Amino acid sequence: ARAALTQDTVWVCTEGQVQDLPVAGNAVIGVEAELAYELACDLPPREQPYSEADVLAAVRAAHAAIEVCDTRYAAWGVQGEWSRLADQACHGALVVGSGRADVAALQPLSVPVSLWVNGTLAVQRPAWGNPAGDPLRLLTWLANEGAHSLGGLRAGQWVTTGSCTGTVLVAPGARVMAKLGGIGCAELQCV
C-alpha cells in the first residue's frame, strides 16, 4: 500500500537531534523503525519502466526514520484494509534522522535494525525485518506504478519503505530511538 505523506507530518532532523513530537491529539502512539529515501531527481511517469539503477541514481541519500502510527478512528487496529488506507495508512508522523549518501554501496537487506523506547531495547533484528522484501524493489515499483496517480516522484520527496520492526505502542512522554546499522539513527521525544 502507499499513501502520500503531508508536509506537516514530516520532520527532518539534523545529526544527533531529538525531535520533540506533539502527541496530545493522538488516539494511539505506535512507533516503527523504517528506512527513508530522499530523492534528488524527479522520476515522472514514462513509457519505459525505470530500472533499479535508474531509481538508485535518483536517490540523494538513505536515512533512518521513525514512523509514528495513529488513527483517526475511535479504535486502533479494527478497520479493514480500505478503511486503513483512507486513514492515510495509519500515518501520524515521520521523523527522519541521520543517513548516508552512498546508497549504491548500501545493502539494506543485511542492515541490522533496533528500536529503543526509554533507553530499553524494544525490538532488534539482525537484518531487514520488512516482510515486503527489498526496499529498492519497493522504491522501483513506486516509481514505475505506485506513484503514477500522484504525477510520479519528485526531487526533495521522502519515500519510506515500511516498518522493519512492526509497531510498538508507547505512552505520552516516551523517548524513542531507531538505529539502522551503517545508515543512521532517528530519535524523538513524545511531548
Where are these regions (language model features)?
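Catalytic-core "active-site belt" of small-molecule-metabolizing enzymes
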Residues: 1-134, 139-140, 147-148, 175, ...
